[in-house]
Amino acid sequence: MKILHIKKTNWLLPFKIIEGSTVSQQPQFQGRVLVLPDTDCWFDVLDQKQNLKNIDEKIYLALVKLAELHELGWIHGDIKKEHFRKFKQELYLIDFEKTRLISSPDPITDATPRYMAPELFHGANKTVQSDLYALGIVLYEWLTQTRLQANSYHEWAVLHCQKLNVVLPSSFQVFLPLLSGLLQKQQQNRFSNVHEAINCLKMLST
């Protein structure tokens, strides 16, 4: 486990996930285990009549949380819906098992295919922009209350590289420019950092 002391904030980056029930049987982890409380998913069930301001705020806080990690010099590497958690009304980003330094990425493709940016299927390294693409998929599935479907790694590659077509419910069309910037298939056309996405969201809110 790496502990970062930056900006008076402690970030714990665990690199091994173990079952809670086995902790007592593994003395080598004594004093080095991070126990997470039971939490709710940040991106929960969404009603199309839900207040747009509340939706905007949830998206904004998720972007800010990801920006904090990037500013510390890390790529999350496995952004997915389940890793944004709500605890005591606060947002937490969890599960840093696949986190990589921005300055020294590696070519290992160990992300979840549902959320993989197109370039990762072609062997590219994970980047800030692949994190952004994954967040775009999270937001797309949340706003549409649907799940993308594929039956194999190859089908996921075809979906992300060729077939993905972003269409939002009429009540959430205001967020289409944000999702378009997050989900561009060509990396050079995607938002280059989280702050570009935040600025886009702010413009949509004015």
Language-model features and meaning:
Residues 106-120:
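Conserved activation segment of eukaryotic-like protein kinases, specifically the C-terminal portion
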Residues 131:
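Conserved catalytic-loop aspartate of Hanks-type protein kinases
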